[in-house]
Amino acid sequence: MTDVAIINYGAQHDYPAMLHELANGLHVFSHNPLAHTAGLGSYEHVEDCEFVPYAELRIRQLARTRRFAHIITDNEYDLERAARIREDLGIPGQSARSARQFRDKVVMKQTAGRTVATPRYARLTTIVDLTRFIADNDYPVVVKPVSQGGSRDIVVLRDENDLMAFSRRHWREDLMVEDFVDGEIYHVDAILAPGYRFVASSRYLRDCLGVLSGQNNGSLQLDPAGKLSRRLEEFLDRVLEAFDTPEVGAYHLEVFRTPEDEFVLCEIASRVGGSRIPALTRLTYGLDLHTTWLRLSCGLPVDPAPNTPPAALRGSIGIVPQGRPVRAPQSLPFDWVEHYQVNEQLALGAVAQNSTSNLCFALVRGADTAEVEQRLLQVEEWILDNLIEADGPARLPAP
């Protein structure tokens, strides 16, 4: 029997199905409760799993009586922990050095800067580091935690007034600053392994940071055979040349495209892209990113990577929490909407807390990127015109 330890985050994963050949040797520790656990070697729902060391301690205890072949995780915040366990137990997979290159955004920029353009940046110890950076580089700048995701706790400072307002916030010990880069933002999602290569490129509908100020956002897939997709794929390869990469890797790359048509690294993560990216990929390419990545990581066979042009492209639009008591319509009147979901868990009056906060979201189909974008904007307009006013408290944080 092959034993595999899994530190899980995703609430919908079905590990007995995804890794069915190994099911009775899977030992799963999950941040979110899982519905499909029958047949697993062991399973524990660990409250706040990504914040507490329990899963790591239990895996090390279990390793006294069994030989784990693999330690895997779907969660960016567990990459370093999983790598540390692997190295201590002599298990192949992503190293701690590699995980840190992708997790610490200062180290990430230092690493990527060997092969591609990055914004100017600095790690912050005190407010003086920030003011010196601004004096040297001018406004606007972006201040953010070095290891956070989902646009959480990111602040754009455009002038002295913004700086003074920022100085009233609680100081954190994990901050960095970088130039604000003007331009469109693209994302490239890939799974790379010996004999396997899948790369797909998309453009964000708007700036991800706009969600925090009330802008709706989403993304739209690019034609995989188009010149821009090929350029983005080449940029991904150049970025990864600078990194220590595991034999099997999933990557979510975010790229600025400046008005001068130059690419500048935003960030790269060593995991599957979040939000609607997995769902859009399944609809267009018939590929489950998580299943493919985890099966390859465990040495299990997968179907060949898609290599024919897709019949259609897709995109997503998320309507941000409105900050006032409203409800989203329960359905949409468009036959090209392939999925629509209302966030029933959202408190009335909630406001956005990160780039994935939503009142509702829709996935749409189109013949090409231009039609997808037009339909996303049509859906956005229709939903906003049909919000339902409701009684309730105002300005609660979104879950």
What positions do the PLM features span?
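Short, flexible turn/loop "capping" segments at secondary-structure junctions
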Residues: 145-147, 212-213, 352-358
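ATP-binding N-terminal substructure of ATP-dependent carboxylate-amine bond-forming enzymes
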Residues: 1-97, 128, 300-303, 367-368, ...
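Active-site nucleotide/adenylate-binding loops and adjacent lid/helix of ATP-dependent enzymes
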Residues: 102-182, 193-195, 222-238, 377-380
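Glycine-rich phosphate/pyrophosphate-binding beta-alpha loops
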Residues: 151, 269-285, 345
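Peripheral (often C-terminal) accessory segments that flank ATP-dependent C-N-forming ligase machineries
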Residues: 5, 133, 294-399
